[in-house]
Regions:
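Conserved CoA-thioester-binding segment of acyl-CoA-metabolizing enzymes
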Residues: 1-54, 79, 93
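Glycine-/small-residue-rich active-site loops that bind phosphorylated ligands and cofactors
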Residues: 23-24, 58-59, 110
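Alpha-helix capping and helix-loop boundary segments enriched in small/acidic/polar residues
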Residues: 26, 75, 79, 106-109
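Short, glycine/charged-enriched secondary-structure capping and boundary segments
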Residues: 31, 66-69, 117-120
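Catalytic-core regions built around general acid/base machinery
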Residues: 38, 87-98
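Short beta-strand/turn micro-motifs composed of small residues
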Residues: 54-55, 106
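Glycine- (often His-adjacent) and acidic-residue-rich active-site loop
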Residues: 55-90
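Glycine-rich beta-to-alpha active-site loop
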Residues: 95-122
């Protein structure tokens, strides 16, 4: 299975790549949690001076939350919706409060949660 989010240190930057190009890099719960965790680690690491996020593929930065998944599995599992949105909003809040510059390389389709990944950064 391919990693849905890639993390790489390049020089003094943490590079985050959303890696679901077939799904237009739509966010799922695991992605929101892993980005939030990586952001916390980067903000407490003095070697990291800024964070860069981009989307894999050539069609989208991020099409937002994975509404196909939420629609398919969320009907029988309300907690799936609640947990996803709770943790996605926590991630957005962490981005907004980050003490280090956050750069979103927006190229292609960007909607909903993709906008959240880009506009909240300092």
């Amino acid at each position: 299975m391919m990693d849905e989010v890639l993390f790489e240190t390049r020089g003094h930057a943490l590079w985050i790549t959303l890696n679901r190009p077939a799904a237009l890099n739509a966010l799922n719960h695991a992605m929101a949690v892993s980005i939030h965790r990586a952001l916390f680690d980067a903000c407490t690491d003095p070697a990291v001076q800024h964070i860069v996020i981009s989307g894999a593929g050539d069609r989208a930065f991020c099409a937002g939350g994975d509404v196909a998944l939420l629609g398919r599995e969320g009907r029988a599992n309300r907690a799936l919706w609640e947990n996803f949105f709770h943790d996605e909003y926590r991630m957005n809040q962490a981005i907004a409060r980050a003490p280090k510059p956050w750069v979103a390389l927006i190229d292609g389709i960007t909607m909903g949660g993709g906008v959240g990944l880009s506009i909240h950064g300092p």
